[in-house]
């Protein structure tokens, strides 16, 4: 059965339309709609007798709500917080105080949390203060969400409302994941530490190095803030790339003239995020295990570092390592056609599809028709799924066969084809 999840900003009109569509499907005898009816409203044995109120109840329960009215309250509460309408929030909460403790989006796995945390995500300070006065207890989670979203004023407000509590349970992991420089700086200003008695906070590093966000300059700055607060990063070429430190890469190249021909294992890419390195072919897009610094730069959208490498002798057609089953050998061009950055381009058209990295490689002579075989599997956060194999594909073939098109750049595909690329 469909498992429905309210979006971060739900739309009541859309839910009304969904209920009417569900009712029509039930009356038409649609198998999925009938199965939903039986699962969520087994007492109604005659589908032809279903009314709109019945379809609304089925829909509400499929969203995890106990009733249609509970679903409506959730949407109205979310909408009021988005509009910064404190009066409506107060009315809804006082009419049903249980809402103060329940997730606004109903589902237990919603990381936007109860009303105070939900408001903290949006920097709605007046609403945060009011909900605290009404008895909200999710201060730590709300503070974490404010930091993650870079709402520094809200973070400080929650810290003061809580009576300046111990910082032991505050973490830098949230703003590390979203690459929020402001949130990281605010937590450091409060006294949160990146170093623990046993070394750097591994959870924070896993969130920073393994994030699916793409904002190289922000990641560089956050890593330098960690250094300013006691972190001593490993002196490796990949860490220099993570930090955006071309000066350190220059030093590594001087010591190792073969640097640009070397390939790196996934554990080299995520040295302080061991959980990210456990499965070599699991990736956010094109796998990064066994690849060169140019592939790694493409994986993290480090265009300026790639320009420097190409200016200093990097072969634009440098290949990934080939394993004992013949998988590998792909170039960085594959890594630009299918990438995490493309997800953010395609997801609600969030960023322009400039395909800068693809254009850079092609302008520097990358072969658009190199063939390679790849094995790839999605991270759990992107839905997981089976390990898939792609044999003897070109960059265009890789993009066409990749199952999740949100990770495929249409502009990259167009550019590759314009440079003579074939399937």
Language-model segments: residues:
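Intrinsically disordered, low-complexity eukaryotic regions enriched in glycine, serine
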Residues: 1-91, 95-96, 107, 118, ...
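Ankyrin-repeat boundary/"N-cap" motif
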Residues: 73-79, 102-118, 137-148, 165-177, ...
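Short coil/turn connectors between adjacent alpha-helices in alpha-solenoid helical repeat scaffolds
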Residues: 210-217, 341-356, 406-409
């Amino acid at each position: 059965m469909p498992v429905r999840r309210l979006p971060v900003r739900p739309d009541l009109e859309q839910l009304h339309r969904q209920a009417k569509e569900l009712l029509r499907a039930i009356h038409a005898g649609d198998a999925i709609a009938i199965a939903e009816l039986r699962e969520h409203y087994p007492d109604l044995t005659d589908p032809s007798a279903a009314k709109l109120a019945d379809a609304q109840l089925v829909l509400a329960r499929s969203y995890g709500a106990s009733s249609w009215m509970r679903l409506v309250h959730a949407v109205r509460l979310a909408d009021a917080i988005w509009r910064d309408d404190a009066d409506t929030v107060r009315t809804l909460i006082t009419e049903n105080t249980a809402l103060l403790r329940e997730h606004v989006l109903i589902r237990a796995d919603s990381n936007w949390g109860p009303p105070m945390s939900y408001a903290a995500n949006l920097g709605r300070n007046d609403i945060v203060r009011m909900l605290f006065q009404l008895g909200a207890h999710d201060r730590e989670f709300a503070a974490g969400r404010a930091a993650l979203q870079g709402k520094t004023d809200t973070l400080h407000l929650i810290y003061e409302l809580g009576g300046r509590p111990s910082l032991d349970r505050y973490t830098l992991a949230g703003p590390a994941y979203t690459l929020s420089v402001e949130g990281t700086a605010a937590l450091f200003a409060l006294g949160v530490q990146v170093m623990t008695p046993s070394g750097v906070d591994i959870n924070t590093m896993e969130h920073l190095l393994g994030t699916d966000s793409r904002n190289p300059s922000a990641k560089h700055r956050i890593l330098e803030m960690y250094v300013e607060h006691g972190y001593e990063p490993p002196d490796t070429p990949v860490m220099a790339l993570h930090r955006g430190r071309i000066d350190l890469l220059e030093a590594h190249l001087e010591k190792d003239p073969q640097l640009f021909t070397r390939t790196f294992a996934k554990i080299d890419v995520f040295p302080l995020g061991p959980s990210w390195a456990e499965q070599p072919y699991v990736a956010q897009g094109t796998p990064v295990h066994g690849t060169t610094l140019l592939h790694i730069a493409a994986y993290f959208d480090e265009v300026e570092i790639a320009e420097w490498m190409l200016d200093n002798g990097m072969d634009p057609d440098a290949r990934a390592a080939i394993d004992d089953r013949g998988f590998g050998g792909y170039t960085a061009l594959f890594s630009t056609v299918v990438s995490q950055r493309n997800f953010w381009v395609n997801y609600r058209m969030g960023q322009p599809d400039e395909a800068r990295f693809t254009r850079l490689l092609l302008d520097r002579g990358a072969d658009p028709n190199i063939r390679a075989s790849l094995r790839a599997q999605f991270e759990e956060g992107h839905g997981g799924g089976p390990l898939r194999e792609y044999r003897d594909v070109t960059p265009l073939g890789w993009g066409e066969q990749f199952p999740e098109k949100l990770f495929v750049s249409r502009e990259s595909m167009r550019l590759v084809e314009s440079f003579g690329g074939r399937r």
